[in-house]
Protein backbone atom coordinates (compact mmCIF):
# COMPACT_ATOMS: atom_id res chain seq x y z
CA UNK A 1 0.00 0.00 0.00
CA UNK A 2 1.22 3.43 -0.70
CA UNK A 3 0.53 6.76 0.81
CA UNK A 4 -2.10 8.92 -0.74
CA UNK A 5 -1.09 11.77 -2.98
CA UNK A 6 2.00 10.00 -4.31
CA UNK A 7 2.14 7.67 -7.28
CA UNK A 8 2.56 4.05 -6.32
CA UNK A 9 4.42 3.18 -9.48
CA UNK A 10 7.53 5.03 -10.53
CA UNK A 11 6.54 4.96 -14.20
CA UNK A 12 3.03 6.29 -14.69
CA UNK A 13 2.86 5.02 -18.27
CA UNK A 14 2.61 1.41 -17.06
CA UNK A 15 -0.47 2.02 -14.87
CA UNK A 16 -3.10 1.23 -17.54
CA UNK A 17 -1.36 -1.99 -18.45
CA UNK A 18 -1.35 -3.20 -14.90
CA UNK A 19 -5.05 -2.41 -14.63
CA UNK A 20 -5.95 -4.62 -17.56
CA UNK A 21 -3.89 -7.49 -16.18
CA UNK A 22 -5.62 -7.22 -12.78
CA UNK A 23 -9.07 -7.19 -14.37
CA UNK A 24 -8.37 -10.30 -16.41
CA UNK A 25 -7.04 -12.24 -13.47
CA UNK A 26 -9.95 -11.18 -11.22
CA UNK A 27 -12.49 -12.23 -13.84
CA UNK A 28 -10.73 -15.54 -14.33
CA UNK A 29 -10.71 -16.30 -10.64
CA UNK A 30 -14.27 -15.06 -10.06
CA UNK A 31 -15.52 -17.78 -12.32
CA UNK A 32 -15.54 -21.42 -11.38
CA UNK A 33 -11.87 -21.56 -12.14
CA UNK A 34 -10.55 -24.04 -14.54
CA UNK A 35 -13.54 -26.18 -15.51
CA UNK A 36 -13.43 -29.81 -16.38
CA UNK A 37 -14.37 -28.93 -19.92
CA UNK A 38 -11.19 -26.93 -20.29
CA UNK A 39 -8.27 -28.35 -22.18
CA UNK A 40 -5.78 -27.89 -19.35
CA UNK A 41 -4.13 -30.97 -17.92
CA UNK A 42 -4.15 -31.95 -14.29
CA UNK A 43 -0.56 -30.92 -13.91
CA UNK A 44 -1.41 -27.43 -15.04
CA UNK A 45 -4.31 -27.33 -12.59
CA UNK A 46 -2.01 -28.30 -9.80
CA UNK A 47 0.33 -25.55 -10.89
CA UNK A 48 -2.41 -22.97 -10.74
CA UNK A 49 -3.48 -24.14 -7.31
CA UNK A 50 0.06 -23.89 -6.05
CA UNK A 51 0.32 -20.41 -7.46
CA UNK A 52 -2.92 -19.45 -5.65
CA UNK A 53 -1.61 -20.86 -2.37
CA UNK A 54 1.63 -18.96 -2.77
CA UNK A 55 -0.30 -15.76 -3.35
CA UNK A 56 -2.61 -16.32 -0.40
CA UNK A 57 0.12 -17.10 2.10
CA UNK A 58 0.66 -13.43 2.80
CA UNK A 59 -2.99 -12.99 3.72
CA UNK A 60 -3.71 -10.45 1.02
CA UNK A 61 -2.96 -9.56 -2.52
CA UNK A 62 -1.88 -5.95 -2.48
CA UNK A 63 -1.13 -5.62 -6.16
CA UNK A 64 -3.66 -7.85 -7.87
CA UNK A 65 -6.81 -7.68 -5.82
CA UNK A 66 -7.07 -3.94 -5.31
CA UNK A 67 -10.29 -2.31 -6.27
CA UNK A 68 -10.74 0.15 -9.05
CA UNK A 69 -11.30 2.95 -6.58
CA UNK A 70 -7.96 2.38 -4.98
CA UNK A 71 -6.41 2.30 -8.43
CA UNK A 72 -8.08 5.53 -9.38
CA UNK A 73 -7.04 7.17 -6.12
CA UNK A 74 -3.50 6.03 -6.66
CA UNK A 75 -3.35 7.41 -10.16
CA UNK A 76 -1.42 10.68 -10.49
CA UNK A 77 -3.24 13.75 -11.71
CA UNK A 78 -3.31 14.34 -15.47
CA UNK A 79 -1.11 17.37 -15.10
CA UNK A 80 1.58 15.30 -13.54
CA UNK A 81 1.18 12.54 -16.10
CA UNK A 82 1.73 14.94 -18.95
CA UNK A 83 4.46 16.60 -17.01
CA UNK A 84 7.18 14.89 -18.89
CA UNK A 85 8.32 18.38 -19.72
CA UNK A 86 11.76 18.69 -21.33
CA UNK A 87 14.46 20.28 -19.26
CA UNK A 88 14.26 24.00 -19.76
CA UNK A 89 17.61 25.74 -20.33
CA UNK A 90 18.65 28.37 -17.83
CA UNK A 91 17.48 31.80 -18.63
CA UNK A 92 20.11 33.85 -20.48
CA UNK A 93 20.03 37.57 -20.81
CA UNK A 94 19.93 38.99 -24.37
CA UNK A 95 23.23 40.77 -23.84
CA UNK A 96 25.02 37.51 -23.09
CA UNK A 97 23.47 35.90 -26.14
CA UNK A 98 24.73 38.72 -28.32
CA UNK A 99 28.24 38.38 -26.96
CA UNK A 100 28.26 34.62 -27.64
CA UNK A 101 27.05 35.12 -31.19
CA UNK A 102 29.62 37.84 -31.71
CA UNK A 103 32.40 35.48 -30.52
CA UNK A 104 31.28 32.80 -32.99
CA UNK A 105 31.26 35.30 -35.82
CA UNK A 106 34.79 36.37 -34.92
CA UNK A 107 35.93 32.75 -35.14
CA UNK A 108 34.54 32.41 -38.67
CA UNK A 109 36.01 35.75 -39.67
CA UNK A 110 39.44 34.69 -38.45
CA UNK A 111 39.60 32.08 -41.22
CA UNK A 112 38.48 34.47 -43.93
CA UNK A 113 40.69 37.38 -42.90
CA UNK A 114 43.91 36.15 -44.62
CA UNK A 115 42.09 35.98 -47.95
CA UNK A 116 40.31 39.34 -47.65
CA UNK A 117 43.02 41.35 -45.92
CA UNK A 118 45.86 40.13 -48.15
CA UNK A 119 45.54 43.07 -50.53
CA UNK A 120 45.38 45.73 -47.85
CA UNK A 121 48.00 44.42 -45.40
CA UNK A 122 51.48 43.34 -46.59
CA UNK A 123 52.06 39.61 -46.69
CA UNK A 124 54.68 38.21 -44.32
CA UNK A 125 56.30 36.15 -47.09
CA UNK A 126 56.50 39.17 -49.36
CA UNK A 127 58.85 40.82 -46.86
CA UNK A 128 60.83 37.61 -46.36
CA UNK A 129 63.40 36.49 -48.97
CA UNK A 130 60.75 34.23 -50.53
CA UNK A 131 58.89 35.50 -53.55
CA UNK A 132 55.08 35.33 -53.51
CA UNK A 133 52.64 35.48 -56.41
CA UNK A 134 50.99 38.59 -54.97
CA UNK A 135 54.00 40.78 -55.59
CA UNK A 136 53.11 43.22 -58.37
CA UNK A 137 54.93 43.02 -61.68
CA UNK A 138 56.23 46.56 -61.36
CA UNK A 139 58.95 45.45 -58.95
CA UNK A 140 62.39 45.00 -60.43
CA UNK A 141 63.99 41.61 -60.77
CA UNK A 142 66.04 40.46 -57.80
CA UNK A 143 68.95 39.47 -60.02
CA UNK A 144 69.13 42.95 -61.55
CA UNK A 145 70.32 44.33 -58.20
CA UNK A 146 72.74 41.47 -57.66
CA UNK A 147 76.11 41.25 -59.45
CA UNK A 148 74.51 38.96 -62.03
CA UNK A 149 73.71 40.37 -65.45
CA UNK A 150 70.07 40.32 -66.47
CA UNK A 151 68.87 38.53 -69.60
CA UNK A 152 67.76 41.75 -71.27
CA UNK A 153 71.27 43.17 -71.21
CA UNK A 154 72.83 39.89 -72.34
CA UNK A 155 70.61 39.44 -75.39
CA UNK A 156 72.00 42.22 -77.62
CA UNK A 157 75.62 41.53 -76.69
CA UNK A 158 75.54 37.82 -77.57
CA UNK A 159 75.75 38.07 -81.37
CA UNK A 160 78.64 40.51 -81.12
CA UNK A 161 80.75 38.34 -78.81
CA UNK A 162 79.57 34.91 -79.85
CA UNK A 163 83.03 33.76 -80.93
CA UNK A 164 85.48 33.50 -78.04
CA UNK A 165 88.50 33.61 -80.33
CA UNK A 166 87.64 37.12 -81.53
CA UNK A 167 89.03 38.52 -78.29
CA UNK A 168 92.69 39.25 -77.68
CA UNK A 169 95.27 37.71 -77.85
CA UNK A 170 93.57 35.70 -80.59
CA UNK A 171 93.12 37.16 -84.07
CA UNK A 172 90.47 36.62 -86.69
CA UNK A 173 90.87 34.07 -89.44
CA UNK A 174 90.37 36.75 -92.05
CA UNK A 175 93.31 38.72 -90.75
CA UNK A 176 95.53 35.65 -91.02
CA UNK A 177 94.45 35.10 -94.61
CA UNK A 178 95.14 38.72 -95.43
CA UNK A 179 98.61 38.41 -93.97
CA UNK A 180 99.37 35.41 -96.16
CA UNK A 181 98.22 37.32 -99.25
CA UNK A 182 100.43 40.27 -98.33
CA UNK A 183 103.38 37.91 -97.85
CA UNK A 184 102.99 36.62 -101.40
CA UNK A 185 102.77 40.13 -102.83
CA UNK A 186 105.81 41.27 -100.88
CA UNK A 187 107.81 38.34 -102.24
CA UNK A 188 106.76 39.13 -105.83
CA UNK A 189 107.72 42.82 -105.61
CA UNK A 190 111.53 42.31 -105.40
CA UNK A 191 111.37 39.81 -108.27
CA UNK A 192 109.62 42.33 -110.51
CA UNK A 193 112.14 45.04 -109.66
CA UNK A 194 114.98 42.66 -110.51
CA UNK A 195 113.46 41.89 -113.91
CA UNK A 196 113.05 45.58 -114.69
CA UNK A 197 116.69 46.23 -113.89
CA UNK A 198 117.82 43.34 -116.11
CA UNK A 199 115.80 44.41 -119.20
CA UNK A 200 117.18 47.95 -119.03
CA UNK A 201 113.84 49.65 -118.49
CA UNK A 202 113.57 52.69 -116.31
CA UNK A 203 114.28 51.26 -112.84
CA UNK A 204 112.66 52.61 -109.76
CA UNK A 205 114.91 54.79 -107.66
CA UNK A 206 116.55 53.04 -104.75
CA UNK A 207 115.15 55.52 -102.26
CA UNK A 208 111.57 54.71 -103.26
CA UNK A 209 112.16 50.98 -103.01
CA UNK A 210 113.59 51.39 -99.57
CA UNK A 211 110.61 53.49 -98.50
CA UNK A 212 108.22 50.78 -99.71
CA UNK A 213 110.11 48.00 -98.01
CA UNK A 214 110.51 49.91 -94.77
CA UNK A 215 106.75 50.56 -94.69
CA UNK A 216 106.10 46.87 -95.21
CA UNK A 217 108.53 46.04 -92.43
CA UNK A 218 106.86 48.53 -90.07
CA UNK A 219 103.41 47.04 -90.68
CA UNK A 220 104.47 43.46 -90.08
CA UNK A 221 107.30 43.79 -87.60
CA UNK A 222 106.10 40.86 -85.48
CA UNK A 223 107.98 37.87 -84.21
CA UNK A 224 106.58 35.62 -86.93
CA UNK A 225 107.87 37.84 -89.78
CA UNK A 226 111.36 38.62 -88.57
CA UNK A 227 113.00 36.27 -91.06
CA UNK A 228 111.05 37.71 -93.98
CA UNK A 229 112.03 41.29 -93.11
CA UNK A 230 115.68 40.27 -92.94
CA UNK A 231 115.43 38.67 -96.36
CA UNK A 232 113.85 41.82 -97.82
CA UNK A 233 116.60 44.03 -96.43
CA UNK A 234 119.25 41.74 -97.89
CA UNK A 235 117.53 41.79 -101.29
CA UNK A 236 117.35 45.60 -101.31
CA UNK A 237 121.04 45.93 -100.55
CA UNK A 238 121.92 43.41 -103.22
CA UNK A 239 119.77 45.25 -105.81
CA UNK A 240 121.57 48.52 -105.04
CA UNK A 241 125.06 47.11 -105.40
CA UNK A 242 124.50 44.52 -108.13
CA UNK A 243 121.85 45.51 -110.69
CA UNK A 244 122.49 42.51 -112.92
CA UNK A 245 121.76 39.98 -110.15
CA UNK A 246 118.18 39.32 -109.03
CA UNK A 247 117.33 39.73 -105.37
CA UNK A 248 116.35 36.10 -105.14
CA UNK A 249 119.87 35.14 -106.04
CA UNK A 250 121.17 37.41 -103.34
CA UNK A 251 118.80 35.77 -100.87
CA UNK A 252 120.05 32.39 -101.92
CA UNK A 253 123.63 33.55 -101.62
CA UNK A 254 123.01 34.96 -98.19
CA UNK A 255 121.44 31.66 -97.30
CA UNK A 256 124.41 29.92 -98.82
CA UNK A 257 126.77 31.83 -96.55
CA UNK A 258 124.80 30.68 -93.57
CA UNK A 259 124.90 27.15 -94.91
CA UNK A 260 128.67 27.34 -95.31
CA UNK A 261 128.94 28.18 -91.65
CA UNK A 262 126.96 25.08 -90.76
CA UNK A 263 128.97 22.81 -93.04
CA UNK A 264 131.65 22.21 -90.44
CA UNK A 265 129.46 20.61 -87.75
CA UNK A 266 127.46 18.74 -90.37
CA UNK A 267 130.59 17.11 -91.78
CA UNK A 268 131.65 16.09 -88.30
CA UNK A 269 128.19 14.59 -87.66
CA UNK A 270 128.40 12.64 -90.93
CA UNK A 271 131.83 11.37 -89.97
CA UNK A 272 130.49 10.16 -86.63
CA UNK A 273 127.19 8.68 -87.85
CA UNK A 274 128.37 7.54 -91.28
CA UNK A 275 129.70 4.00 -90.62
CA UNK A 276 127.23 3.27 -87.79
CA UNK A 277 124.08 4.78 -89.34
CA UNK A 278 122.88 1.54 -90.95
CA UNK A 279 123.17 -0.59 -87.80
CA UNK A 280 120.97 -0.24 -84.76
CA UNK A 281 122.56 0.79 -81.49
CA UNK A 282 123.22 -2.19 -79.28
CA UNK A 283 125.41 -2.10 -76.18
CA UNK A 284 128.20 -4.60 -76.57
CA UNK A 285 128.01 -5.72 -72.95
CA UNK A 286 124.39 -6.85 -73.44
CA UNK A 287 124.64 -8.05 -77.03
CA UNK A 288 125.38 -11.65 -76.14
CA UNK A 289 122.21 -11.84 -74.03
CA UNK A 290 119.98 -10.75 -76.91
CA UNK A 291 117.88 -13.17 -78.92
CA UNK A 292 119.38 -12.10 -82.25
CA UNK A 293 122.99 -12.43 -81.15
CA UNK A 294 125.51 -13.82 -83.60
CA UNK A 295 129.32 -13.64 -83.32
CA UNK A 296 129.57 -12.33 -86.89
CA UNK A 297 127.86 -9.07 -85.89
CA UNK A 298 130.59 -8.29 -83.38
CA UNK A 299 133.08 -5.82 -84.85
CA UNK A 300 136.74 -6.56 -84.49
CA UNK A 301 138.50 -4.82 -81.58
CA UNK A 302 140.70 -2.91 -84.02
CA UNK A 303 137.75 -1.42 -85.94
CA UNK A 304 136.05 0.22 -82.95
CA UNK A 305 138.17 3.38 -82.42
CA UNK A 306 138.45 4.23 -86.13
CA UNK A 307 135.47 6.59 -86.12
CA UNK A 308 136.94 8.45 -83.17
CA UNK A 309 140.27 8.78 -84.90
CA UNK A 310 138.66 10.46 -87.94
CA UNK A 311 137.20 13.25 -85.84
CA UNK A 312 140.32 13.99 -83.85
CA UNK A 313 143.33 15.57 -85.48
CA UNK A 314 146.47 13.57 -86.12
CA UNK A 315 148.41 15.37 -83.40
CA UNK A 316 146.05 14.06 -80.67
CA UNK A 317 145.93 10.49 -81.94
CA UNK A 318 148.65 9.14 -79.70
CA UNK A 319 147.36 10.76 -76.51
CA UNK A 320 143.82 9.45 -77.02
CA UNK A 321 145.01 6.05 -78.23
CA UNK A 322 146.88 5.61 -74.99
CA UNK A 323 143.83 6.46 -72.90
CA UNK A 324 141.25 4.45 -74.89
CA UNK A 325 141.54 0.69 -74.58
CA UNK A 326 141.34 -1.29 -77.78
CA UNK A 327 139.82 -4.40 -76.24
CA UNK A 328 136.07 -4.66 -76.48
CA UNK A 329 133.75 -4.54 -73.52
CA UNK A 330 132.35 -7.94 -74.37
CA UNK A 331 135.76 -9.49 -73.84
CA UNK A 332 135.85 -7.95 -70.36
CA UNK A 333 132.53 -9.49 -69.44
CA UNK A 334 133.69 -12.92 -70.51
CA UNK A 335 136.68 -12.68 -68.19
CA UNK A 336 134.41 -12.43 -65.13
CA UNK A 337 133.76 -15.72 -63.34
CA UNK A 338 130.40 -17.24 -64.20
CA UNK A 339 129.04 -17.02 -60.67
CA UNK A 340 125.39 -17.36 -59.82
CA UNK A 341 124.02 -13.90 -58.95
CA UNK A 342 121.62 -15.44 -56.43
CA UNK A 343 124.50 -16.99 -54.54
CA UNK A 344 125.63 -13.53 -53.45
CA UNK A 345 122.10 -12.48 -52.51
CA UNK A 346 120.57 -13.27 -49.10
CA UNK A 347 118.64 -16.15 -50.66
CA UNK A 348 120.00 -19.62 -49.95
CA UNK A 349 121.72 -21.26 -52.91
CA UNK A 350 120.59 -24.50 -54.53
CA UNK A 351 123.92 -26.17 -53.87
CA UNK A 352 123.48 -25.75 -50.12
CA UNK A 353 120.13 -27.53 -50.16
CA UNK A 354 121.50 -30.66 -51.84
CA UNK A 355 122.94 -33.26 -49.37
Curated annotation (Swiss-Prot):
PTM annotation (Phosphoserine): residues: 175, 294
Modified residues (N6-acetyllysine): 19
Alphabetical keyword list: Acetylation, Phosphoprotein
Residue intervals passing through the bilayer: none
Extent of Low complexity compositional bias: 336-348
Modified residues (Phosphotyrosine): 293
Signal peptide residues on this chain, from the entry's feature table: none
Feature: compositional bias, Acidic residues: 45-54
Full protein name: Uncharacterized protein FLJ45252
